[in-house]
């Protein structure tokens, strides 16, 4: 009897030993870094990863908060497989320019999404009417590692302003996320909230309710200076239909939201991810309708300035989607 029990235990042990590693090996873990809560990236990233996990056999996923600059660096370090960024940011990352002191040469384009619009909101009743007026004010350009923070720094530079010069003149620069920025403006602790996001943005809609906001524009002279410093940024507008109370379009700069992948992501898996996401495009509209409606699958290669992942390119060739 004792020998029979020992034999059964050994058989069970062998079954566990033989089959558990095989099942674990069959699971491929995909890590995505998207954006902060309060924006479009985080909820859409979470929805995308859930779609991938539910529809691609043997794949497990996660979606974490991040920023356009930091996400590129995370992929280069092998900490992420997929990341949200902007086309001009990925170009700088790939080439080691701007905020990147080293080349992120593992970056590959997966898909272009909707336009990212740089928005500078100030309280409606403030005496701030130009970017130049921010030289001694209290601002929130975003968190360190956010693409919006880098663009804010660039726009201010075109007007002869730096984060350091603001502080020297008695102003403050608060590197906080969307939710904290909204709280600071509602409490009267900041004068300008900056972000590059879809338009309209939930945080600004909230701020437009209280205290009420208006937007600072970028004039043609300074638009040219910005383009000289960063050719990847393009002139665009905050349309007058974006937020209640607007009476005219506001000129600003913009870019294209992009999902990038690691060159180490297997081609077949990249193909399946792109194919699966586009097959469930209507499901993503339930999360952020306006953002996804502005993300035309036929423009999946819009603004691309880095190599396209071979797996993604295979899908685009099948669908007849060509480079912009």
Which residues are covered by each model-predicted region?
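Acidic, polar ligand-binding/catalytic clefts
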Residues: 80-114, 198-202
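Bilobed "Venus flytrap"/periplasmic-binding protein-like clamshell domains
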Residues: 29-61, 116-187, 302, 306-311
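Pocket-lining segment of extracytoplasmic ligand-binding domains
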Residues: 87, 96-99, 126, 162-265
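An extracytoplasmic/periplasmic, membrane-proximal ligand-sensing/linker region
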Residues: 180, 186-187, 192, 197-215, ...
């Amino acid at each position: 009897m004792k020998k029979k029990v020992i034999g059964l235990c050994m058989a069970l042990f062998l079954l566990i030993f033989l089959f558990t590693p095989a099942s674990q090996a069959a699971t491929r873990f995909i890590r995505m870094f998207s954006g902060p809560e309060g924006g479009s990236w985080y909820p859409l990233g979470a929805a995308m990863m859930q779609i991938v996990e539910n529809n691609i056999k043997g794949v497990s996923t996660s979606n974490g908060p991040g920023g356009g600059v930091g996400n590129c660096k995370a992929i280069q370090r092998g900490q992420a497989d997929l990341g949200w960024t902007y086309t001009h940011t990925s170009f700088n990352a790939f080439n080691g320019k701007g905020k990147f002191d080293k080349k992120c040469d593992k970056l590959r384009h997966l898909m272009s999404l909707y336009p990212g619009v740089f928005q500078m909101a100030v309280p409606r009743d403030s005496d701030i009417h130009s970017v130049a007026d921010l030289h001694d004010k209290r601002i929130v350009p975003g968190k360190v590692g956010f693409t919006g923070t880098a663009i804010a720094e660039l726009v201010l530079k075109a007007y002869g302003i730096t984060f350091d010069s603001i502080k020297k003149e008695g102003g403050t620069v608060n590197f906080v996320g969307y939710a904290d920025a909204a709280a600071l403006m509602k409490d009267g602790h900041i004068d300008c909230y900056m972000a590059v996001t879809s338009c309209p943005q939930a945080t600004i809609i909230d701020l437009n309710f209280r205290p009420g906001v208006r937007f600072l524009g970028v004039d043609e002279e300074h638009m040219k200076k910005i383009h000289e410093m960063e050719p990847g940024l393009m002139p665009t507008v905050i349309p007058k239909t974006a937020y209640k109370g607007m009476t005219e379009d506001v000129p600003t700069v913009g870019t294209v939201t992009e999902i990038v992948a690691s060159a180490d992501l297997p081609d077949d898996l990249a193909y399946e991810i792109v194919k699966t996401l586009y097959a469930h495009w209507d499901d993503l509209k339930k999360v952020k309708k306006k953002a996804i409606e502005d993300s035309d699958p036929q423009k999946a290669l819009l603004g691309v300035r880095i190599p396209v992942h071979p797996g993604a390119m295979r899908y685009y060739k099948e669908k007849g989607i060509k480079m912009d």
